């Protein structure tokens, strides 16, 4: 697999934000309140019954076997999610710095109200903003924010978060580039994982043959 080198701009400038560093010279920064609003749509009355979950940085439909024991009435306390909503797990930043905390919804459904649900506003791309928040998550920048004993995040943190004032077309181009390249990387990872699984299988066969048959597989064996 060959990855195309990411196109670069001709000139950059200091963003004025220490953790952002330099940005393209024609990009500007605005507070997150221009890009995000907080979604608080209650599922009171069971408007939706498809239960979603944030798992490894993706919003997935929760498998039926994971719903065993849950009382349907409890889903009335969940919040409604729509495609392009960005879901954030905001709790316990201090003690958990390994889990992926952001996910982009592709389905209609409901999710626990313990999560923050961000709706993208105006001329902003949900895919681009999710990649942006995902980058802040994986580089641990997101852990600079938050408050309280366990450093929980809130919508206020995202209202203050610096976001880029760039055209929708630029955002879409970046998101499309990342969709393509990350899909290629995921495919390469899957191939490598298959190769590793085959090598591990060969290793186990080799060990089993060596310890039970000796080093010469042509030597006649006798019943143990």
Predicted regions and their residues:
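Short amphipathic coiled-coil heptad-repeat segments
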Residues: 1-23, 183-224
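Sequence-specific dsDNA recognition surfaces
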Residues: 15-16, 30-49, 53-86
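Positions in alpha-helical segments
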Residues: 15-18, 113-116, 156-160, 183
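A short beta-sheet element
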Residues: 79, 83-138, 144, 154
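Amphipathic alpha-helical segments
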Residues: 24-32, 129, 159-200
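Non-catalytic DNA-recognition/assembly elements of restriction-modification systems
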Residues: 11-43, 160, 168, 172, ...
């Amino acid at each position: 697999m060959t990855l195309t080198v990411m196109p670069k701009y001709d000139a950059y400038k200091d963003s004025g934000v220490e953790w952002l560093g330099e940005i393209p010279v024609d990009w500007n920064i605005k507070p997150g309140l221009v890009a995000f609003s907080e979604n608080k749509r209650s599922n009171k009355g069971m408007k939706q019954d498809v239960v979603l979950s944030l798992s490894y940085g993706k919003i997935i439909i929760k498998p039926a076997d994971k719903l065993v024991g849950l009382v349907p009435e409890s889903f009335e306390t969940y919040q409604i999610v729509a495609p392009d909503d960005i879901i954030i797990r905001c709790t316990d930043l201090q003690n958990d710095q390994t889990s992926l905390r952001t996910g982009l919804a592709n389905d209609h459904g409901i999710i626990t109200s313990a999560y923050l649900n961000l709706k993208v506003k105006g001329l902003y791309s949900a895919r681009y903003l999710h990649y942006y928040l995902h980058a802040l998550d994986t580089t641990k920048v997101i852990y600079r924010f938050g408050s309280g004993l366990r450093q929980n995040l809130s919508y206020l943190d995202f209202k203050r978060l610096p976001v880029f004032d760039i055209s929708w077309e630029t955002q879409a181009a970046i998101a499309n580039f990342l969709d393509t390249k990350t899909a290629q990387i995921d495919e390469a990872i899957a191939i490598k994982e298959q190769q590793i699984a085959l090598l591990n299988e060969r290793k186990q066969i080799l060990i089993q043959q060596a310890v039970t048959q000796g080093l010469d597989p042509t030597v006649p064996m006798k019943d143990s």
